[in-house]
Curated annotation (Swiss-Prot):
PANTHER family: MITOCHONDRIAL DNA REPAIR PROTEIN RECA HOMOLOG-RELATED, RECA. Residues 339-361 have a biased composition (Basic and acidic residues). Keywords: ATP-binding, Cytoplasm, DNA damage, DNA recombination, DNA repair, DNA-binding, Nucleotide-binding, SOS response. Belongs to the RecA family. It comes from Levilactobacillus brevis (strain ATCC 367 / BCRC 12310 / CIP 105137 / JCM 1170 / LMG 11437 / NCIMB 947 / NCTC 947). It is found in: Cytoplasm. HAMAP family: RecA. This is Protein RecA. InterPro entries: AAA+_ATPase, DNA_recomb/repair_RecA, DNA_recomb/repair_RecA_CS, P-loop_NTPase, RecA-like_C, RecA-like_N, RecA_ATP-bd, RecA_C_sf. Residues 329-377 are annotated as: Disordered. SUPFAM superfamilies: P-loop containing nucleoside triphosphate hydrolases, RecA protein, C-terminal domain. GO terms for cellular component: cytosol.
């Protein structure tokens, strides 16, 4: 009986492969690439919170939060990390608000960044589809879902009712995009705003525009919120920002990362490194004093951050120990291997797809000392 069932299964598998092509069905264990390929987020703390060392390739990521919370900053750091590893990035600026000078300050190479400022939501999503389908793009950022206005609303009169148009647009687009995103290993990063649901008496009244489709299709959803202001005397020089992993299909969710977003500098590498080093007892905190080994590195967090920034050798040593403690890879080695992988990539019809052993760089997270938007979008 078992032999008959196996023979019937083998016959069905052969027919499926004949009808739909080789590789249309396979045993999961036969797939040599079982590890999740990732690209670092640009924040070591966020890489750890994500559980896999960064944003997963071939998946959809949503970043949402209140105004000026740092959503665009987080997205631009991801773009900078992709470019740092030799990848190609595209930015669909539906809000028409991207600041090239700020993007440059965060480490984005604006000469190589592909930018589109679409007139309608349909146009923006069609452009994203064309870019992703090319197989030559590593990350596409859509800023933002709320600004993807359907053509009917653009061409209509002010005050006209267009119930559910944007939700239908997003649902249709994501049905089409999800398969292509997975095949091309592109990261599709959607920035979203928040709205208040009317009449909610109990529970959280906040929701995100664009319907429910994005919530379902997203592998990772990040909630970005300002926690407190960072001051130098009476001057506000940045924000302490909490990033919560609300949804995660590739690792346990609900982890948090706290980062300093400094005006004009972005996510502070020294700030998160200091916090993580204290958490793992690599740096000792006694009262307001911070010490590393026999060296006192500062009284107060801001002074300790500045000391690390002024002593790159010590910072590199602390960075290495923190990465080892959290089980994430070395940044410089990752960038080097990524460049080698890009050079050695296969040239045949599977161009753009590399084996797991050829892409260790994209599985290890890295950091870059960068910066928040001046309005901390």
């Amino acid at each position: 009986m078992a032999d008959e069932r196996q023979a019937a299964l083998d016959k069905a598998l052969k027919k499926i492969e004949k009808d739909f092509g080789k590789g249309s069905i396979m045993r999961l264990g036969d797939n040599s690439n079982l590890e999740v390929e990732t690209v670092p987020s640009g924040s070591l703390a966020l890489d750890v919170a994500l559980g896999v060392g960064g944003y997963p390739r071939g998946r959809i990521v949503e970043i949402y939060g209140p105004e000026s919370s740092g959503k665009t900053t987080v997205a631009l750091h991801a773009v900078a990390e992709v470019q740092k590893r030799g990848g190609t990035a595209a930015y669909i600026d539906a809000e028409n608000a991207l600041d090239p000078a700020y993007a440059t300050a965060l480490g984005v190479n604006i000469d190589d960044l592909l930018l589109s400022q679409p007139d309608t939501g349909e146009q923006g999503l069609q452009i994203a589809d064309a870019l992703i389908s090319s197989g030559a793009i590593d990350i596409v950022v859509v800023d933002s879902v709320a600004a993807l206005v359907p053509r009917a609303e653009i061409e209509g009169e002010m005050g006209d009712a267009h119930v559910g148009l944007q939700a239908r647009l997003m649902s249709q687009a994501l049905r089409k995009l999800s398969g292509t995103i997975n095949k091309t290993k592109t990261i599709a990063l959607f920035i979203n705003q928040i709205r208040e649901k009317v009449g909610v008496m109990f529970g959280n009244p906040e929701t995100t525009p664009g319907g429910r489709a994005l919530k379902f299709y997203a592998t990772v959803r990040l909630e970005v919120r300002r926690a407190e202001q960072i001051k130098d005397g009476t001057d506000v020089i940045g924000n302490r920002t909490r990033i919560k992993v609300v949804k995660n299909k590739v690792a346990p969710p609900f982890k948090r990362a706290e980062v300093d977003i400094m005006y004009g500098q972005g996510i502070s590498q020294t700030g998160e490194l200091l916090d993580m080093a204290v958490e793992k007892d690599i740096v000792d905190k006694s009262g307001s004093w911070y010490s590393y080994g026999e060296d006192r590195i500062g009284q107060g967090r801001e002074n300790a951050k500045q000391y690390l920034a002024d002593h790159p050798d010590m910072m590199a040593e602390v960075n290495q120990r923190v990465r080892a403690a959290y089980g994430v890879g070395d940044e410089e080695a990752a960038a080097t291997k990524a460049t080698e992988t890009k050079t050695d990539a296969p040239k045949d019809k599977d161009k753009g797809k590399t084996k797991a052993k050829d892409k260790p760089a994209d599985v290890t997270p890295g950091q870059i000392e960068l910066a928040p938007d001046k309005s901390a979008k």
